[in-house]
Amino acid sequence: MANGIAVAINTLSSELAAGGARTDGSLVKAALASVSPADILLQPIFNPVGGYASYVVPAAFVLILQQMLLIGASLLTVVALTQPVNGAFASVLGRSVAHLTIYLPALALYFIVLPRFYGFSTLGQPLQLFALASLFVLATSFMGQAAGAWFKHPETPTLIFLGTSLPQLFVTGFSWPREAVPKSMQALGYIFPSDFAIDGIVRINQMGASLWEVVRDWRGLWGLTVIYFALAVMSAFLVRRRQAHG
């Protein structure tokens, strides 16, 4: 927008100055020098490509990772709870560690390799990036397990969570102004880890922020991790108990 305004002003100034031009161009040069004594050079810092894709795609990567893990964790939980395995606490924790281990290469691909391949800004520290991203994966895993405990059919999580993808695109505020989203919808978006993760991961990876500068997102993901872990353990315990008495 700033670039467009600057171009429009310079174009108008040039046209006004050229209105009384001389054959040698001296009047035009003098008028332009008085209107714009210094050349304006606009250089985007966090969006060097200057395109919409470089603004949207890094945030979309986070949402893609969340939706895949939500569906996968829920689906595997539906199947796992049909097996005669005791210990809700250990099983929930074990599955989350497995999800995190499997997702580490995906985090490296989506947050390190692909941004550099597409020429996106990558100013963040990898350790801080992976600290926040790992917490995001754990929160998503626990959420998927908590939800998956109450599904009867393995295909149900795919239908439900895919339907939430498009609303999350708008609620998180990167494809639509957050100020234009109703407060009730914003509050509803906080139940998904991607709401905090998109803001925090993009700020760290693309803008070079530290964990301290995204402490709101860090605390939000910790809160969701604890809440969904408790819900996943309780859900697994209740489902096991219902199966034992059913």
Name these PLM-found stretches:
Residues 1-72:
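Transport-system extracytoplasmic interface segments
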Residues 22-24, 107-108, 141:
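A generic alpha-helix surface/boundary motif
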Residues 28-39, 106, 191-204:
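Peri-membrane helix termini and adjoining interfacial loops of integral membrane proteins
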Residues 32, 41, 45, 49, ...:
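Juxtamembrane loop-helix boundary motifs flanking transmembrane segments in multi-pass membrane proteins
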Residues 43-115:
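Hydrophobic alpha-helical transmembrane segments of multi-pass membrane transport proteins
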Residues 101, 112-113, 121-246:
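Membrane-spanning alpha-helical segments of multipass transporters and channels
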